[in-house]
A protein has these predicted regions:
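Symmetry-related core transmembrane helices of the 12-TM Major Facilitator Superfamily/SLC fold
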Residues: 178-195, 387-403
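Helix-loop boundary and gating motifs at the non-cytosolic
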Residues: 16-67, 233-234, 238, 242-260
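Residue-level signature of mid-helix packing/kink "hotspots" within the transmembrane helices
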Residues: 67-75, 160, 275-283, 367-368
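Juxtamembrane intracellular "pre-TM" segments in multi-pass secondary transporters
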Residues: 2-19, 200-235, 418
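Helix-to-loop junctions at the C-terminal end of transmembrane segments
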Residues: 73-85, 170, 281-293, 378-379
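Helix-loop junctions on the cytosolic side of multi-pass membrane transporters
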Residues: 194-209, 403-415
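Structural signature of the two symmetry-related core transmembrane helices
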Residues: 88-102, 296-311
Length: 418
């Protein structure tokens, strides 16, 4: 029989009982997003203007290094959190962030910038993964889409604000060092909040899972999400392609806009508009998927992203590109939290962190692939063809999700027994 003291101390699931920790994790993830945002409008231009890098492929190599490090960190973050606790991995992620702005400020060569982005990738893989898992742990299965919508909204609204501020600062003061002072502040506050106030949520996960549930080994979770379970595989490939076009938007779009004659401030505004729409609308799209199901939002979102990229590729004015990036943000908002919630629907609570780590490994590997593919095609055939190629791949990914969902029917949007 459970004693009164044990019953009293047992974690309770739900947004209401856990709103303080939930709100804290929203704030922490905003600072995680800010670390990436400070780079989005500045670093591609820094490669060309300060380090004299002419090749588009070389100029976007920082995105590739970031994507590689983040993908690997994602893969192991869930497994490490099962062994050492969510909070410990969150704090470790912030420790990797601390040197990044200083390296970017003082980097004597482009190799140092690539190294800084390896550290930033680990920061994002550990810290962002843990804010995702900790929020899911706290709220339980019924509010999963809402929780992830709030998490991703906070992160990507912060990306937008930081990208815009960095662009404005760079326009007024230069590409270095002033824009990267933002990163020093973000890392200091994010680390302090995580160390002083964040609490581990592994106990909440165990309440949902039950007392005798055992986690699936990483090797098996990797196989299931990569080739064994068609529904999981369809979600994994959609995440990969979604970030393929994000890698293109991060690495290639600033170069494309600069080659078209836009000022740094306008490039910063465009770089901010995409994550601004993406982040803001996730407040609605995650909750919507809880009610109407995941698949319709994923398929429609991927198709809208493909259309947006096609418009960006043929556009030749600031107004057209602003509309295209707004549409890209809309499509991404429909997809991003919904894919995460769908993974959570299809696996047991004890497997969730590990399987989400595998999914995020492939998803963020897409950013690396998008930067390298976009850079290589841009070097050979020009920016516009690179953008149109990724547009076609994105639309095709949405069709693939629809086909597999029709072949393997079953509504996602609620817990599935596996």
């Amino acid at each position: 029989m459970v004693g009164l003291a044990e019953l009293h101390s047992r974690p309770v699931l739900g947004l209401g009982p856990n709103w303080r920790q939930f709100a804290l994790l929203v704030a922490i993830n905003a600072f995680v997003g800010g670390m990436v945002g400070m780079e989005r409008s500045v670093l591609p231009l820094l490669a060309k203007d300060e380090f004299g890098i002419a090749s588009s492929t070389a100029a976007v190599s920082f995105v590739a290094s970031f994507g590689l490090a983040k993908a690997i960190a994602n893969l192991y973050a869930g497994n490490l959190s099962e062994r050492f606790g969510r909070r410990s991995v969150l704090i470790a992620g912030w420790l990797f962030a601390v040197p990044v702005p200083f390296i970017l400020i003082f980097a004597p060569s482009w190799g140092w910038v690539i190294g800084a982005n390896l550290l930033l990738g680990v920061n994002q893989g550990f810290a962002w993964s843990m804010t995702v898992n900790m929020k899911i742990d706290l709220v339980g299965p019924s509010r999963r889409g809402l929780a992830l919508g709030l998490n991703e909204a906070a992160g990507y609204l912060s990306v937008a604000v930081a990208a815009y501020l960095a662009g404005v600062i760079a326009q007024s003061h230069g590409l270095r060092p002033e824009p990267f002072y933002l990163g020093i502040a973000f890392a200091a506050v994010g680390l302090a909040l995580s160390v002083c106030f964040a609490r581990d949520t592994s106990g909440h996960m165990r309440v949902e899972a039950g007392p005798h549930a055992a986690a699936t080994p990483l090797r098996r979770a990797f196989a299931e999400a990569t080739w064994r379970r068609p529904r999981l595989v369809s979600l994994t490939q959609a995440g990969f392609v979604n970030n393929l076009n994000d890698g293109l938007a991060w690495g290639i779009f600033p170069l494309f806009f600069a080659a078209s004659g836009l000022s740094i401030e306008r490039i910063g505004l465009l770089a901010a508009s995409y994550p601004l729409v993406w982040g803001g609308l996730q407040l609605v799209t995650g909750w919507t998927s809880d009610i109407f199901g995941r698949t319709p939002l994923i398929v429609a979102g991927m198709l809208i992203q493909g259309i947006a990229l096609a418009i960006a590729g043929v556009g030749d004015s600031f107004g057209t590109w602003l509309i295209a990036l707004g549409l890209l943000g809309l499509g991404t908002a429909m997809v991003y939290p919904t894919l995460l919630a769908s993974i959570g629907d299809l696996v047991r609570p004890t497997d969730r962190a590990t399987t989400l780590g595998v999914y995020r490994f492939w998803r963020d590997g897409g950013a690396m692939a998008g930067a390298l593919l976009g850079g290589a095609v841009a070097d050979l055939f020009g920016f516009k063809l690179a953008i149109e190629l990724v547009a076609a791949l994105t639309a095709g990914s949405g069709v693939a999700v629809l086909v597999i969902a029709l072949m393997k029917p079953g509504r996602t949007g609620q817990e599935v027994t596996v």
